[in-house]
Amino acid sequence: MKRISIISPAYNEEDNVEACYQAVADLFAPGAPLEHYEREHIFADNASEDSTATILRRLAESDPCVKVILNARNFGPFRSNFNALRYATGDAVVVFLPADLQDPPEVIPEMVKHWENGIEVVAGLRANREETLMLRTFRRIFYRLSNSLSNFEIPENVGEFQLIDRKVWEVVISHTDHYPYIRGIIASTGFKRLILPYTWKARKRGISKNNALALIDQALNGIFSFTTVPLRLCSFLGFIIAFFAFLYAVFTIIMTLFDASAAPAGIQTMITAIFFFAGVQLAFIGLLGEYVTAIHAQ
């Protein structure tokens, strides 16, 4: 019997973890779409401050299909989820099913169906999002910027709610990033992928733990994890600034030869030196970044 592993991160989700557990268990019950598959449900608690950990312990004691990872502190959503991913033993793995059930578990049987037909990555796409206009706009800007800078495409509104084959899982967990951007890692593997649209639901219980600063942090991590364009742009701008500073120095010398009183003594030299050395510093910062990137890639 094939096994399906499902990863559910949680942080202060005492109102949702039991509902998440039951929703997944119902998919594998007799007569349900996944009755012929073995279930492995891994909860990763990110040092919750409420009774989430207590509830998860009780679920694990009563159901051998449930595994629980209790983090010693809050490591953030990406690191916590990636750590839990390492413990998956299934033939296919649902990378991210958050306990708040905004990503609907009822989509998983269709994901499994496509996987059985040879698709190695079934990526859920949030075709409809029950969220504010500001958040939608922010996400749209992020995806367009990220895709314009990276060497591969992450479809807009595709998150970590994806089902991946075991061989994709092996490639993904081989990454040793300190702060892994999971959807980017999966997209970079290049395996056969299918996009599956679904409606991302509004949260029914509790409040979201993702504030504006957390979203910005995740966006910056996504942008800088898979592209060297900002570093090269830094070098390019540095050389450009230094070049124009040099031209200005030549222009200043020529003007001084014709009219020594064109500006107070030393002003042109100071302006030229400031811009020239600022440009040189910026260029070498970019070059240093290129070397660090090369070391990281090795």
Residue ranges and their predicted role:
Residues M1-R3, Y181-Q298:
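Hydrophobic helical membrane-anchoring modules
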Residues E13-A32:
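Short, well-formed alpha-helical segments that are part of the catalytic scaffolds
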Residues N71-Y87, Q102-G184, K201-L220:
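Acceptor/aglycone-binding surface of glycosyltransferases and processive sugar-polymer synthases
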